[in-house]
Amino acid sequence: MLYKLIYLFQTDISWLNVFRYITFRTILTTLTSLVIFFILGVWAIKRLRTMQVGQYVRDDGPPNHINKVGTPTMGGCLLLPIIMASTLFWAELENVFVWLVMFVIVCFGLIGFVDDYLKTIRKSSRGLSIKSKFPLQVLVALVGAIVLYLYPGFDSRLNVPFFKAITPDLGWAYIPMAVFIIVGASNAVNLTDGLDGLAIGPIIVAFSSYLVFAYLAGNVKTASYLQIPYVPGSGELTVLCGAVLGASLGFLWYNAYPAELFMGDVGSLPLGAVLG
């Protein structure tokens, strides 16, 4: 959005051409999401405490989990809007990959929000039942996988690390594999959330790596030089990864020991899905 407005003046103001570079916009989106989270983080924690939105833990859980009862949760309600706003500010909005990832973020975020909301009104660790949550996750992942598979120029070949000559074509089998990975990663991150920095730490490491690979795969020269698959348009995902990275670093400030805020299912489910 903001990138497009700046683009209109590039012919008149030469130094604005720097905004054409993905690396520069990635730095901006990382800083944008980081600063916004720092500014709004304290307000969000106070608001959640006022609304009595606290962490609920099963009675049979380990002692270090039980000690976290009452800590404000649903921090994802701040995390996700910051990620999306920063992405909308600095990303190329005509890129289908950006919109596909944001679709997954919104849908999994809504599933997580309903789950957290039910836990809050019931004042227990019971949210959405597995019979309700799992089919919804599979449906969203299935839509995303099908859209990606049908995208013109999409390559369903699987690249095996360290064996560049082995590239089996998955064909339609790519869709169920993608669904399995997306849903599995979503629930894996969800399971780790609940202790100080336990979920957000690996997320920061993972998205830092994704940021680099998205940039390399989206640049035909570097992809060819490093002999990695070239995916046209994927470079713009670097900007989105920067937004996730910045917001996650801001969240870590409040989630590190002693944790003042947890992301809840509304944050862990979509971040895990995007990770997948």
Annotate each predicted stretch with a short phrase.
Residues 94-102, 121-136:
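Membrane-interfacial loop-to-helix junctions in multi-pass inner-membrane proteins
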Residues 2-43, 79-110, 144-150, 156-163, ...:
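Alpha-helical transmembrane segments
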Residues 68-80, 131-140:
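Select subsegments of transmembrane alpha-helices in polytopic membrane proteins
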Residues 112-114:
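Conserved ATP-binding subdomain of kinase catalytic cores across diverse folds
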Residues 119-129, 160-168:
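Membrane interface segments of multi-pass transport proteins and intramembrane proteases
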Residues 3-13, 50-51, 63-66, 74:
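N-terminal structured helix/loop subdomain that forms the ligand-binding/catalytic interface
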Residues 43-68, 117-126:
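Cytosolic, membrane-interface loops and tails of multi-pass inner-membrane proteins
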Residues 75, 116, 265:
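Divalent metal-coordination and catalytic microenvironments
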